[in-house]
């Protein structure tokens, strides 16, 4: 049997503030349609708490406009959820006729960092990785840590 080393990371929860999300939402991305779509999917995820896998399957049948809610069964945990459409979500969903753009996850995660870079999210984040008894510290700017969940 092969032996594997366990790599652990020590981090506090990293999140974006409402101001940072607003800055990302307000970015002029007219020069890059794909990045604009990624931004809209990302913002929708932030304000609904939906995982990327659920956002990628969101369709008009999940939207209840009368009650301003999203009603769907989460893919990962197979649980039905009802989510209020708040902040930017109604505007974004309407923009795409209630059917968000379908973006491959690897492209999404690769390019979503660019949103943070353009929004100048430069707060320093320290990540400590443990490999056996050794601890390796590395510092990232906040934009480098952005990804889907």
Residue ranges and their predicted role:
Residues 1-52, 56, 66, 76, ...:
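Basic, Lys/Arg- and aromatic-enriched nucleic-acid-binding interface segment
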Residues 10, 44, 97, 144-145:
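Generic anion/oxyanion-binding catalytic loop in active/binding sites
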Residues 12, 79, 142:
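Glycine-rich, flexible loop/turn motifs
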Residues 23-27, 64-69, 73-120:
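Basic, alpha-helical nucleic-acid-contacting "clamp/cap" segments
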Residues 30-32, 98-102, 110-149:
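Short, basic (Lys/Arg/His-rich) helix/loop patches that form interaction surfaces
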Residues 57-63, 149:
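A short, basic/aromatic helix-end/turn motif that makes direct DNA contacts
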Residues 61-64, 87-89, 129-135:
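Active/binding-pocket-proximal capping segment
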């Amino acid at each position: 049997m092969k032996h594997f080393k366990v790599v652990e990371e020590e981090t506090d929860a990293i999140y974006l503030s409402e101001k940072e999300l607003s800055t990302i939402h307000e970015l002029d991305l007219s020069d890059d349609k794909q990045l604009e779509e990624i931004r809209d999917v990302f913002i929708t995820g932030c304000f609904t708490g939906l995982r990327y896998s659920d956002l990628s399957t969101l369709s008009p049948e999940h939207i209840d406009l009368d009650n301003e809610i999203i009603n769907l069964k989460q893919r990962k945990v197979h649980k039905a959820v009802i989510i209020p459409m708040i902040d930017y979500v109604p505007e974004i969903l309407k923009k795409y006729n209630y059917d968000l753009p379908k973006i491959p996850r690897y492209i999404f995660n690769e390019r979503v960092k660019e949103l943070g870079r353009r929004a100048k999210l430069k707060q320093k984040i320290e990540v400590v990785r443990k490999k056996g008894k050794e601890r390796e510290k590395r510092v990232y700017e906040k934009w480098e840590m952005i990804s889907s969940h």
